[in-house]
Amino acid sequence: MKQTILSISLLAFISTQSMWYDKQPIEQPIAIDTLLMAVMAVESNFDTMAYNEKENAAGVLQIRPIMVREVNRLLDKDKYTLKDRWNKAKSIEMFNVIRSHTKNPTNERIARNWNGGWNGHKKKSTLKYWQKIKQQIK
């Protein structure tokens, strides 16, 4: 009985993991655009040395360790390190990995997922963040 429950729980967990992101990224170059500029403005005011000690978020895009791990997981290799969060170009690459794996990508979904994880687009806590991003895009 325990094994059946565990198997069902594991199956449910695995099936929800792919609901909000595409396992295969969109194969197209993604340039720096208004969304990325808005996210950098909101996250750090374009400061590559910005650091939020409370969240251990670093760099121009305020990347936390969990995001580095997630990007590496999506790429299926350890391409990025925590040190790369301080590098603007590598931070942008990580943002673009997340963006390219976002299912049904819109600026809102990408921004809210960047702020709140793969289910960020459904969290009330990311609405205020999205409003800040929209103000920057205007």
Functional labels for PLM-detected ranges:
Residues 4-14:
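Sec-dependent N-terminal signal peptides
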Residues 31-47, 95, 109-118:
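Short, functionally critical alpha-helical segments immediately adjacent to catalytic or ligand/cofactor-binding
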Residues 38-77:
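Secreted/periplasmic proteins that engage bacterial cell-wall peptidoglycan
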Residues 21-28:
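Extracytoplasmic and endomembrane cell-envelope/extracellular-matrix remodeling and assembly machinery
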Residues 48-49, 121-124:
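Extracytoplasmic/secreted cell-surface and envelope-processing proteins
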Residues 29-32, 54, 105-107:
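Extracellular/periplasmic catalytic domains that process cell-envelope and extracellular macromolecules
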Residues 14-21:
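C-terminal segment of classical bacterial N-terminal signal peptides
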Residues 65-122, 130-138:
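Alpha-helical segment that forms one wall of the substrate-binding/catalytic cleft
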